[in-house]
């Protein structure tokens, strides 16, 4: 049976509990997170998208996960927050894409998930003002970050990391997380130290 063709694009935002800069990408997921384990929230603001005949324009979703040790060792606990405006068909499409069940970039991570925590619905609000951004999903997720700049005090472009192999985007902007609050699907994490990692980028995914 042929898989459903799909394509989505928009903006991706993430914070994690690792100190800035997160070591997991340059360490090829073989090194321990800076706090031993890592909790992360990857938020996706879909500007244009479809899953078969199901339109996904304007919706959002957040992938939450806890990795108990080095990411490459697996045994992640992961779940999804879907936009409460999504219909049942749209929610199913978001779940298939975000979990990797529909193929695409997230399929590369699906084998690392030991426990799927399920799907919860909430209003998801994205706010972007220049180098600052925030994502809020009711009382479940509330995170914000600001782009990281280099040593040149006159720089106008933020630091970027390229050729990452990250499923969200191969190239993204590094950011300092100003706050991260996650209380959803059995996961709990709060940080307002300003020392944690953030990153963001445009994203474009499609089925294989």
Where are these regions (language model features)?
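Short, surface-exposed loop and linker segments with low hydrophobicity and enrichment for Pro/Ser/Thr
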Residues: 32-37, 69-74, 118-136, 173, ...
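N-terminal start-of-chain detector that recognizes signal peptides
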Residues: 13-17, 33-34, 50-55, 106-107, ...
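Short C-terminal domain-edge/linker segments immediately following a structured domain
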Residues: 46-52, 75-76, 110-115, 156, ...
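Charged linear interaction tracts used for macromolecular binding and regulation
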Residues: 76-159
């Amino acid at each position: 049976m042929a898989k459903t063709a799909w394509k989505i694009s928009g903006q991706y935002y993430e914070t994690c509990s690792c100190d800035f800069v997160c070591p997991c990408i340059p360490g090829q997921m073989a090194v321990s997170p800076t706090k031993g384990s890592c909790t992360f929230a990857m938020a996706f603001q879909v500007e244009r998208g479809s899953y078969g005949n199901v339109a996904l324009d304007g919706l959002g979703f957040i992938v939450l996960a806890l990795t108990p040790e080095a990411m490459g060792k697996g045994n992640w606990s992961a779940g999804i927050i879907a936009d409460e405006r999504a219909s049942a068909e749209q929610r199913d499409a978001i779940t298939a894409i975000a979990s990797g069940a529909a193929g695409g970039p997230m399929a590369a991570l699906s084998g690392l998930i030991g426990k799927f925590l399920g799907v919860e619905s909430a209003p998801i609000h994205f706010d972007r003002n220049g180098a600052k951004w925030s994502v809020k999903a009711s009382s479940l997720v509330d995170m914000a970050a600001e782009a990281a700049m280099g040593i040149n005090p006159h720089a106008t472009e933020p630091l970027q990391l390229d050729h990452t192999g990250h499923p969200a985007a191969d190239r993204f902007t590094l950011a300092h997380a100003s706050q991260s609050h996650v209380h959803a699907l059995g996961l709990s994490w709060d940080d307002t130290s300003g020392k944690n990692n953030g990153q963001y980028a445009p994203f474009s995914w499609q089925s294989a």
